[in-house]
Amino acid sequence: MPSSYSFDVVSEFDQQELVNAIDQLRREVDQRYDLKDSKTKIDIKEDELSIVSLSDMTIESVKDILLQKATKRNLSLKIFDFQKIETIGGNMVMQIVKLKKGLSQEISKKLSKLVRDNMKKVTASIQGDSLRITGKNKDDLQAAINLIKKQEEELDIALQFQNYR
């Protein structure tokens, strides 16, 4: 029996599922009658999406479809950070959607402090863009998971628990 147990708290999403959701989005935009002539383009980069179209209303429709497709593919909606809609040349508008991945130092510190203040039998250590929680008892780790899950809504970030050891 191990002397201590641990798990990692991370904020990640499945990149392939996101690509699949974007492909479905493009297909639906091409086929829908109200969006067919909108010249809408959706580009995906490593950490952001860009949506270019003729009007704000079209971008809002595309945004709704994106959220619907992401939900069907089990992607958390908290990974999307929608920026302000900007006007670009040629009567076009663009919206950048930042993709949230990894725990920031600020959020890691908040979670670490939360665990240290509320649970004396477990330790939290920041490891890059993840947080490792270690304890001698599995029940204490379960309590730490429940404590962090309660805080997840307030932090507005999607959290996952990995590497249970």
Curated annotation (Swiss-Prot):
Q: Name one Pfam family in it.
A: DUF520
A GO term for molecular function: nucleotide binding
Q: Signal sequence: where?
A: none
| Organism expressing this protein natively | Prochlorococcus marinus (strain NATL1A)
Q: Which Gene3D superfamilies match?
A: 3.30.70.860, YajQ-like, domain 2 (3.30.70.990)
Top-rank taxon of the source lineage equals Bacteria
Q: Which GO terms describe its cellular component?
A: cytosol
What protein is this chain from?
A: Nucleotide-binding protein NATL1_05371
